[in-house]
Amino acid sequence: APGRCQCLATCTNDALKGEAFCKEHMKFCPRSAPLSGSEPRYEPGRWNNDDTVRLTHNCFSYSYNIIDPRQIEACKKDPKCDLPFHQPGSKSGYPRFNNTDPKTCPNMIARLMGDNPKRILPSSFELKCPRGTSKIALVVDEDQDYHFLRQDKPKPGSKTGFFSQKSGAMPVTNLDAKGHKIFDVALADHNFDNSKRKDPLNYDHFCGYFCIPRHDPIFIKTGGSRGELRREAKFKQTRRK
């Protein structure tokens, strides 16, 4: 079945194939997520074409538009490229994730804000992020996982900044679980339970939108179950022309 129209929460129409909107709202949607001008470009090839990048970066690093050269070098030295991902909360000293602790919105937001105090601002769909920052979104499957998405720069000729995502080591995509463009993360489909994925997930809790720095130094850190391989990194975000 197709996903719902993402224009308005009150619209119950199905979205057109591959689109975020129903037939009625393809012509005009009265709502939009305003752009700050600092949104990253949607460049799936930059993340998907090289396995040392794709296998070592997850939704968190993708939402920050960070490619960590140390992850790539470590992957080249490991035949299986089995490395821990960057995780929210690792920088600020939160314990590693385990299979029993729920990934709730309050817990994940505390981890996100704790890594970069005063740099990350809670936001909303129709609120414009300050210049030099742009919007990401957080959803969770409380039993299993968290997931971040980011708003991208519009395509030439368009004024709409759609969202894109990268699930774990999977390729980057600008479509939701039902193959529709992502206009409003809160109204898009994140139920991967019926897909061919090996790890069925249903991110059924929307935690909110956040504005994150795009040109200032920002901290993230890896953390996982593979020994104590945890590396802190300070990244200078740069605008890609």
Where are the model-predicted features located?
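Disulfide-bonded cysteine motifs in exported proteins
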Residues: 2-6, 17, 24, 70, ...
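Extracellular/secretory pathway and lumenal proteins
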Residues: 9-11, 15, 26, 79, ...
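Cysteine-nucleophile protease catalytic domains, especially the papain-like/related folds used
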Residues: 30-119
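...with weaker cross-activation on analogous glycine-rich loops/strands in unrelated enzymes
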Residues: 96-170
